[in-house]
Design a protein with these regions (language model features):
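Extracellular, disulfide-bonded carbohydrate-recognition/adhesion ectodomains
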Residues: 1-112
Length: 112
């Protein structure tokens, strides 16, 4: 079961917090999971975007817990394929697609 945490944290702080709770930052593996996340963000988040477990490492995006990246919800245009150095963490908002975002920004986050 997923749980939204509204206390804004950097991506690394959010990951550490989730792992201290014996969970991880959430993976969004389907359109259904995206819709559920959008609803939860609208109802609870204190920031426009929230952190997910999506991270750009090496030359690709991956879920930090090892889930396969079969479902993808990037915006058209492909800017996520080679993100700027500071835009290497995945976030999602109330209705839109995934975003490559600055890992040092403090956002609400979802653990599962």
């Amino acid at each position: 079961m997923e749980k939204m945490f509204i206390q804004p944290k950097t991506w690394e702080e959010a990951l550490e917090f989730c792992r201290e709770q014996h969970t991880d930052l959430t993976s969004l593996l389907s359109e259904t999971e995206m819709l559920l996340a959008h609803r939860e963000i609208q109802e609870q988040a204190q920031t426009a975007l929230v952190w997910t477990g999506l991270r750009f490492l090496g030359d690709r995006w991956l879920w930090v817990n090892g889930d396969p990246l079969d479902y993808q919800a990037w915006p058209p245009g492909g800017g996520h394929q080679c993100p700027a150095r500071n835009l290497r963490c995945g976030a999602v908002g109330t209705a839109g697609p995934w975003e490559a975002h600055d890992c040092q920004e403090k956002l609400s986050f979802i653990c599962y």
